[in-house]
Amino acid sequence: MRLLQGSFSMPNAHNRPHVFIVQADLPRLKTDAWLLPCDAGFHVLSSWIPQEYQAGLAQRNTDTYVLPVALFDEWTSGRRRTVRHNDWPGRSMPWLTNVGGGSKYEVAWYLEAVSQFVEEASTWAKAGLKRSRPLLGVPAVGTGFGGQWDKKAGVIDALFDHLVELGRLHDVDIVFTLFDPQSFAAAQLARKRRVEVGSFGWDLDSHLLASATALAERAKAGALVMFLGSGVSVGAGLPTWRDFLGRLADQAGLSDSELEALQNLDAMDAGSIVERYLGGREALEKSTRALLDTQECSLQHALIASIPHEAAVTLNYDTLYESASKVVVGDVAVLPQERNPRAKRWLLKLHGCVERGDLVLTRKDYLRFGERRSALAGIVQALLITKHMLFIGFGMTDPNFLRILDDVRRSLGDVSNEKDLSHPIGTVLMLNHDPLRNLLFDADLKMESMASAHAPDSARQLEIFLDLIAFRSASTTAFFFDSTYDALLSAREREFRDALQNLHQEFAEDRPENIWAEFEKLMAKNIKE
């Protein structure tokens, strides 16, 4: 095993704590615990509080709410700056943390608050541990209304270093969560500099390091599309397809023997049986909505959304991918219902959406799919032929998708005996080794197993793999025209930036029309990226 271009200073170590970086909405991200910024009076900005929770809170003003937490001596004196807030609607546990210091405080003051949070939250999270180690969420404290907004670069740079050390000290994983593309790019640049000097790396086997880097190159070239299976949503607390059927069957009152028989049926036939036991279509859809009722994305959703891509395909009914992507690119066009040519990303939902009442759950649904099924299959076939498809959380057992894959295989020419993987049409990320399944697809798809003797948690290895793709494909120039990130630019880079801005102003009134539009695009790309 080796680390990418740089590693932690500890030789021959494996399965170490990791700091992930995502562009995401932290209150909507599934973690074991997360830092909820507030001030000494427990005042919290409305952007941190889900709308379903705001109704019962007192408002300080139009943008700020007061959380119902009693003041205590250690808090008012400033000795303690973090406290668990149990009364929260989500599954992830927020810790109110006082980071509202204003401009009078230096960066170290914010880092101390983060230290208190990680120390207390890690101890609490380990008591009910479900992952191999706890996952804590931390935002870029101090860079908004916390008082250091004009020095974002220095805060983000110092905070990333601090999170790496805290993760090692308390044996926890941390997801550093940035809301806008500028701060996300700044965090990735901070990490890049640590990689270059050997103080940060990814604990992955060498073949996975190479595969993730190759996929990142495809993403940067606009050649990568995603295929999301139910495994992606498991980290958000949603069931796999097998568990989903099992829970529906429990609600329908099936016996253990009937449930066992149900699991052996084709998915659509199993759905038909459950529908009958539940009492009809309306009851089936109601139960489905209840089982998929969560507003928190998994870490995999956030990592996938942070990787550049324009299109994705899924059999999932939930809307978590859409929520995760909205933070990065705005609203996602969901096909086949929505046609939004302005959308920067679109998602093809082959089996419908829980919010639209068009779920494909039963054999009757599938048969009624009719001509639309053929049209949607054609879109998937085109993506497989023209792009490289990355399969995540998908077991490669769905008969409808396998039919699509077979059509593509035949259209490209059956090379099943040649075993030529120089140009695979896709990559499948698997949690475990499955040699027999590999034989079925190894002429068309690259099969990557996350299983490792050094890292027993394959799901966590998958997250680290996706984090590496996100890092290798991330822009590090999105903040170029934002002066609050000047600390990340060299003197020469700042000089070049200022010259571009002066040039833009100089010719704004008397534009050379034939090239001005392209120049505007260049400026806008780096401002909004």
Regions found by a protein language model. Name each.
Residues P11, L26-P27, D39-A40, V44-S46, ...:
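Metabolite-binding pocket within alpha/beta catalytic cores that recognizes anionic/polar moieties
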Residues V99-W202:
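Phosphate/ribose-phosphate-bearing ligand recognition and processing surfaces
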Residues C38-G78, F227-M268, A324-V329:
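Adenosine ribonucleotide-centric catalytic and binding domains
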Residues P341-L361:
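Class I SAM-dependent methyltransferase SAM-binding "motif I" and its flanking Rossmann-like core
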Residues Q5-R16, A24, V164-M226, V232-V234, ...:
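SIR2/sirtuin-family catalytic core signature
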